[in-house]
Regions:
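Sec-dependent signal peptide recognition
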Residues: 2-9
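Hydrophobic h-region of N-terminal signal peptides that target proteins for export
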Residues: 9-17
Length: 427
């Protein structure tokens, strides 16, 4: 199906007038009774290389749809695949990547479930092959699939093996020349059977892997605590701290480097985002409560080459608390980060700002002055931001997946009907 390019001039605030132009391209209509299409931890919802862009979403009937656009084109080709997912559970996200030969890799529909992975039958094609294993081991209890591409065209694949409160982080690598997956780390971060790590990661332009995570002691989100960090210079084989001391693997509670100490019952959210700048310095986005007012605030944790720093991003005024299990319905989105030559962009959505696609922006972190940008003139419900990290690294281009979506608390369905799916480009 050919879908013509629909450019919508976005209503921007006066503070955004000096920013690059924004455009929306409609690519289809997606399931919206949960946030399964719009969770921040989709790795990735939209991706690209020098030749093509690709995006994936569940349609109104819960079928996986793949959209391709040739770079420079005004149209998207959208294909409904043979695969369906349990869209009632927002954990069952679709994650995609393009390897160095242009083949699309996809993992989807997993929340403590057997691996569902397939590859396209041809380069830049949406005809997907049969489900297949990767390594064939440790693939029975998978959650949070996330792909990353290396500069030579190989892929990395991270996932949690095990359940909330007692899972381990696993890492595979796809060898482009051999066209097969290999295990790199069986247990990169070990919860020791008592806790698990909720990670976020970023592969920088030099193939350095930046990994950060919070610990969770039980299934209850209120037991999230602390923010930890590790870095790999060799595609996940060895890992080190910011002082260059090497980790003995697996990393545990007692051996981890702590970027920021955050106690339990601080409304600390898991599965947020991180990035790195051109110098390889890591930036981590999250939110938590740290004062008597009980209002969670957006935070930025970053390393400047000498030490870890932490600051509040903007100012929120709506109180809420995090407790219990499942997908939480809260008034703010988990944030997404982009670092460009123009500074730091901190993407979010908050009820008190009209639930629109929004961002805080600063050119100088040390000033702690953040400019508020409104990027849509319409609300997006419970949407969370996910972006094309390849476009960001390749050409400093910010591309977001945008869709209005509802979400009930604890995996409950909302009454939100199917909604338009857009790709937003910010120059």
């Amino acid at each position: 199906m050919k879908i013509g390019r629909l450019l919508l001039l976005l209503a921007l605030t006066a503070s955004c007038a000096v920013k690059p132009d924004c455009s929306l391209q409609r690519i289809g209509e997606g399931f919206a009774a949960t946030t399964v299409n719009t969770c921040v931890f989709r790795g990735f919802s939209v991706t690209s290389d020098d030749n093509w862009r690709a995006a994936a979403f569940y349609d109104a009937d819960s079928y996986v749809n793949i959209a391709f656009q040739k770079q420079g084109s005004d149209t998207w080709d959208v294909t409904r695949t043979q695969y369906k997912g349990n869209t009632a559970d927002a954990h069952n996200v679709i994650s995609i990547a393009l390897d160095g030969d242009g083949y699309l890799h996809m993992a989807f529909d997993m929340h403590s479930a057997p691996l569902k992975y397939c590859r396209s039958l041809g380069p830049y094609g949406a005809v997907m092959g049969d489900l297949q294993p990767m390594t064939g081991t440790g693939e029975a209890d998978v959650t949070y699939p996330e792909f990353h591409r290396l500069s030579n065209g190989d892929l990395l694949f991270f996932y949690r093996d095990g359940e909330s409160g007692r899972g381990n982080l696993v890492l595979n690598r796809y060898n482009l020349q051999q066209q097969q997956w290999q295990r790199v780390q069986d247990v990169l971060i070990d919860g020791e059977g008592r806790r698990n790590a909720y990670p976020q990661m970023y592969v920088d332009s030099n193939d350095g892997i930046h990994l950060s995570w919070v610990w969770r002691e039980t299934w209850d989100v209120s037991t999230n605590h602390d923010m930890c960090y590790a870095y790999s210079p060799d595609a996940g084989v060895s890992w080190q701290r910011t002082d260059d001391t090497r980790y003995d693997l697996p990393i545990t509670l007692s051996t981890a480097e702590y970027a920021c100490r955050i106690p339990q019952e601080s409304d600390l959210m898991n599965q947020t985002s991180m990035t790195a700048d051109a110098s390889g310095h890591p930036y981590i986005a999250s939110y938590w409560t740290s004062d008597e007012r009980g209002i969670p605030q957006y935070r930025l944790i970053w390393h400047d080459g000498r030490k870890w720093n932490e600051s509040t991003v903007g100012r929120l005024s709506q109180p809420f608390s995090l407790a219990g299990g499942g997908t939480k319905k809260v008034p703010i989105a988990r944030p997404q980060l982009a670092v460009t030559n123009d500074g730091v962009y901190y993407f979010f959505r908050a009820e008190e700002f009209g639930s629109k696609v929004s961002a805080f922006h600063t050119r100088k972190l040390t000033s702690e002055k953040w400019e508020l940008l409104e990027l849509t003139d319409f609300p997006v419900g419970e949407w969370e931001p996910s972006l094309d990290s390849e476009a960001l690294k390749r050409e400093s281009k910010i591309t977001l997946f945008v869709q209005n979506a509802g979400q009930g608390d604890g995996e409950q369905l909302s009454d939100c009907p199917p909604q338009n799916v857009y790709i937003m480009d910010i120059r």
